[in-house]
Amino acid sequence: MSLLLFGLGLTLTPPALAEFSLAQIPPLSNKTPITLVAEKGFWTDYLTQEMLPKFTEKTGVKVNVISTELESMFELQTQALLMGEGKYDLLTMEAGWAKEWAANGYTVPLLELAKLYDPDGEKAMESYLEPYYPSLLNILSYNRELHAIPYNNYVMGSHYRADLFENKTEQAHFQQRFGYPLKPATNVEELADQAVFFTRKAGELLAEKPLTHDFYGLALMSGNKPHINDEFSSIIWSLGGAWMWPIYNQQKKLTHFEVPTVNQEAIKAGIAYRKLMPYAYPADDKFAFNEAADAMATGQVAIWPFAYNNLWHASFKVEANIPGARLGVSQVPGGTPYNGAYAFAVSYDSKNPQAAYWLLKYMGTFEAQYAYALGGGNPCRMDVVTAPEFKNASKKAIAGAFEASHVANLFWSTKVLELGHFTSTAMGQIYPELSRACYAASQHEANITDIFIELSTKIKQLQNTHGEVPAIDKKNK
């Protein structure tokens, strides 16, 4: 399947329904039980209690579930895949591993499976994929072939206290102080103004009421965790930069990457990030997405500017916890949110790839993604995200960020192919280095320029060691 297919016909309306149901699964010749690796939480509980029993009843194939934390999934599955003993039939992957696993031959292209097992062949899979966001399919593809079906979209949005932004007194004070209206930040400079403005000490007024505790402008995922890279990446992309640039030939085949020797946009992002930190909720080196969501939920901050929209339900608790609080969502400052998804794929050494294929399709149906949405997840299908009932105020607690996610995903449809972040088969090796460098650059005693010059050298080394195409220096203009 060509990657270009994943960029056609994009509008703000969903495509024609291309629905698959359990009833369409044909009789299976292979009844060997299969094993699914899935993340702990409500989604796996729903699969185990609702969907998998129906699948077994329909097909006669038993499904074993290995439920594990996301943090341990990569190592758990990679070790099994290296052994080639068919331990797992269906894998759960993070988008950053997708191309690496595909390049290693760990996962099977979906069209290859469709040709083998689907009565309608490739056309059935192409039709099945129509409702999915092209951005996510492009991220999960390798050599123009899709290997996985996404289910958990973690595209970013800016979660903010709408009640504070719309307060007349706060609006007047902000206008007087900064000379422009108080609205969700469209760039990191405006975000810095808002961070300063909303940071208050206990006893000061916030929306005409005295604070009983210190209040902060924003929450940053500034701990020594992977997520600080996602914030930095979003800022860098908004400045027109990248960690590495994919270069294509006239046939649109990837030939190599260019890595900036002195990454000016990364340096600017580091400076901007440091300016934000004094106005962020106090964070230790373990502070990440759960802590940031909690800071919003407990009324400690005005903005979580680089929030994962699949945590909207966590941020939204502020409306129950703080009288009068209302949560809003906008695009991230700069308009280039980090994006990706967790996805399911069939392993190369599956003992029953026929059943694994059909279960994969069943777990990605409208029914399944709708249930995922009702549980608080951020779905990957346009027809679910844009379902009319999710626009009702009664569904705001779970679906309040759906429209923002929809716009962000459409923005990234084919643009993800313009960034090395989403096109390198070595990103599983490179990503941890990005995270380490971003955390180091956030520390005030560190030399940002030196850190990112060293990082560029490391990126080249890792790409040239583990990647399929080389990386060379990109000379500064």
Predicted segments, located by residue:
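Extracytoplasmic "Venus flytrap"
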Residues: 28, 33-50, 425
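Extracytoplasmic/periplasmic substrate-recognition and gating elements
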Residues: 32, 144, 164, 259-260, ...
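Short, polar/charged alpha-helical segment
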Residues: 21-24, 41-62, 159
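Hinge/lid segment of periplasmic solute-binding proteins
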Residues: 19-28, 95-157, 208-211, 324-331, ...
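Short helix-initiation/N-cap motifs at beta->coil->alpha
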Residues: 68-76, 186-190, 284-298
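Extracytoplasmic "Venus flytrap"/periplasmic binding protein-like
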Residues: 34, 53-132, 168, 294-295, ...
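Glycine-centered hinge/linker elements that transmit conformational signals in sensory
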Residues: 190-199, 234-286, 326-328
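C-terminal capping/gating helix-and-loop segments adjacent to ligand/active sites or protein-protein/ligand interfaces
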Residues: 141, 286, 399-460
